[in-house]
């Protein structure tokens, strides 16, 4: 399945070519000359992306510390398909140019011409980017843009565990709230329990950040005991401690897998498709709110409070989308969902056909309270509010039209 199909049966496809132009060619300077330190990279015309095949793939893997491969279906003969593939290749070329000195390589694997290589490498999903680092294979499930891809690969190059050794690093750790995070307290890097933790971190790197400390003062502030690991759900203030310390790699991985779907999670460019594919029975509860907007901020704070009060409910998971993070998708979302994203919204979306139903705000001046949101969410979870209800309303409208005939 193509990446663009995932947000509602090819619904994003009409935006993709325009998006690719912007992402590759960049924002025009409008006559202003670039200043030193603010020159955005422009493609220099050097071919760095390699067509990976049966003859060269072993040498390509030996050459790079990290290798990103776009596994693609052959472009069709029509002009639009050819142009789109060229733009995708340009995104890879620009990313390869930026990361050339970092030891990151880029390649293309054709699903028909290079099927044997794809099979050996375990490439299965067309139009996906697979990242190879050592023995790890990471499927990139984010926005296909040069800047997002570069940022992701820079994270891949980092160690899977970040050490906290002082007050500033501890403050930075505590400021992370919009994603899952783990932290463990160990005796030293040579500890077998730290090594198990490090191996577990590699399984989720770079999507889930793992932190560790060997400093007893830092551990005391975090109320961590030796060999203890705390798991923080996104937007939650209090952690869960992984039971039965010290933990093996398998125990840590199992715990994270069981708890990785947060009650409230943010849709991010670098992991947007992974998040969207992780639905509950074919639906998502989706909230749109601009954090920088006063109403959006207030609505988001209410969402956080509701999530914190209901974190024990495994059936509740809300995806928060900040429209500012996806400006080119705002017109598509407004048209598809028939909503106004200049104001906060919360609704239920069917991931198969993008059908949706949205909470009615009784008074546009007053945002829903935590109690009103909880009541609405309870109705959703009990099936009293669902996208089929909206279909029934549409059918009734159609019947009325037929009667008029």
Swiss-Prot record:
Residues 1-34 form the signal peptide. GO terms for molecular function: calcium ion binding; identical protein binding. It is a peripheral membrane protein. N-glycosylated. The modification Phosphotyrosine is found at residue 43. Residues 382-405 are annotated as: Disordered. Transmembrane segments: none annotated. The modification Phosphoserine is found at residues 81, 216. It is found in: Endoplasmic reticulum; Sarcoplasmic reticulum; Sarcoplasmic reticulum lumen; Sarcoplasmic reticulum membrane. Disruption phenotype: Mice are viable and fertile, but have a lower body weight than wild-type, due to a reduction in fast-twitch muscle mass. Fast-twitch muscle from mutant mice exhibits slower contraction kinetics and requires more time to achieve peak tension and to achieve half-relaxation after a contraction. Fast-twitch muscle fibers from mutant mice show a strikingly altered structure of the calcium release units in the sarcoplasmic reticulum with a strongly increased number of ryanodine receptors, plus narrower sarcoplasmic reticulum cisternae. Gene3D superfamilies: Glutaredoxin. Detected in skeletal muscle (at protein level). Detected in skeletal muscle. GO terms for cellular component: I band; mitochondrial matrix; mitochondrion; sarcoplasmic reticulum; sarcoplasmic reticulum lumen; sarcoplasmic reticulum membrane; T-tubule; terminal cisterna lumen. Keywords: Calcium, Endoplasmic reticulum, Glycoprotein, Membrane, Metal-binding, Mitochondrion, Muscle protein, Phosphoprotein, Sarcoplasmic reticulum, Signal. Monomer; increases in response to a depletion of intracellular calcium. Homodimer. Homotetramer and homopolymer. Can form linear homooligomers. Ca(2+) ions promote oligomerization. Interacts (via C-terminal end and preferentially with the monomeric form) with STIM1; this interaction increases in response to a depletion of intracellular calcium, decreases both STIM1 aggregation and clustering, interaction of STIM1 with ORAI1 and store-operated Ca(2+) entry (SOCE) activity. Interacts with ASPH and TRDN. Calsequestrin is a high-capacity, moderate affinity, calcium-binding protein and thus acts as an internal calcium store in muscle. Calcium ions are bound by clusters of acidic residues at the protein surface, often at the interface between subunits. Can bind around 80 Ca(2+) ions. Regulates the release of lumenal Ca(2+) via the calcium release channel RYR1; this plays an important role in triggering muscle contraction. Negatively regulates store-operated Ca(2+) entry (SOCE) activity. Belongs to the calsequestrin family. This is Calsequestrin-1. It comes from Mus musculus.
